[in-house]
Amino acid sequence: LQLTDVFREAVAPYAALEDLYDMEPDAGLGNGGLGRLAACFMDSLASLDYPAMGYTIRYDYGLFKQKVVDGWQTEIPDNWLPGGEVWMVQRQDSAVTVRMGGKVDYIWRDGHMLPVYKDCDEIIAMPYEMIISGYGDGASVLRMWSAKSNRVFDMKSFSTGDYARVMQMQNEAELISKVLYPSDDHAEGKTLRLKQQYFLVSASLQNILADHMRRWKDIRRLPELAAIHINDTHPALCVPELMRLLMDEHGLGWDEAWDIVTKTMAYTNHTVMAEALEEWDQSRVKMLLPRVYDITLEIDKRHNQHLRSKYPGDENKIKTSAILYYNKVRMANLAIVGSHAVNGVSALHSDIIKNTIFHDFYLDTPEKFTNVTNGIAYRRWLCQSNPELSARIADLIGDKFVKHAEELDKLCKFAKDKSVLEKLGEIKLTKKKQFADYVYKKSGLVIDPSSRFDVQAKRIHEYKRQLL
């Protein structure tokens, strides 16, 4: 908004603006590669004046704060909401219900098969909104879902002293939005993660369709007026869930619903390691999401029929491309089958997925595959993070680069300009001194600003390769 200097002057009699920045916690919504990319999407879409809505879970506790004590990792809860929720507005009128568990029976009525849900757990998804400002006057909306129990408080049991059971019933639903990335090295953790994924997907799609119907009245125009981005496989249940909503709630037949789904969804893949592609036990999905599992079963059956028709006798195509295989639900395969566009995040990455892990998909539908190289929101990581450097760049090439990154190419002509390089070196040293002051304030360590800093802003984990 270009108001930093105005606010710095306004608060100067009372505090330094940087001290106020330090008081505001980072939103505990995911700060790894996926979270960073999603945040940059929101900034870019807002700056380019595209109408956009991002969806996430409103976690009570974000990714744990990590300390190393005597060589061992110590995890501390990231209680970010006190201080962080000041930017949020609750939208109680847009709350939706998400159903899990139970069983589904089917009845035929007027030539249509209708699901009948029995003994389901109903969870209220309560939305909160945060406005994401772009450069200038553009803005996007981030909608966050908080899980609330739909069960009526059992006053009778509470009055008879059965407090633990009453509170357990209330708390089970609310666990869904309690912690970002709960541990999944045990069965309960795996189930909770699957609940989180479906909770996010179902609540968000219900909201998207309700918004679409309020504005446009015709569900068949959805692909024309909306695009849904599956950012890695965590939201891949979008595919069967949108099918469920279109068929069960809007009365469409399978073929018409599938046409809408595949024209609306787009999937970004983030890993080239086959062993890292997300899978769920079929039994877990069937138990927790019986209707979604049945739809996934039908999607898989029809996709396999297509492959057998196109490649008769080549069962290896089924082995690599089936959604359900060896008692697993393969989420990347589900996302690819249900999307009209599939991209990697760099030219090399996109080539690898076409030639290795998704090669059979590429042979079948090469028109789906494309590349979208990941960038960064440099207004955040250059202009805001380093205003001195940003101001110097503006002196050299003008300020159009703030909205047009290609303008930065004009800096190449200064590559051997000694005076320019000296000035850039001075700015770099200033920032290193500021960082040294920060390290001293936070840890008591004194570091030499003239030394070389090799920094990896990642949590400590063996696959992050800090030992390199």
What do the predicted segments below correspond to?
Residues 1-468:
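A conserved ligand/cofactor-binding region detector
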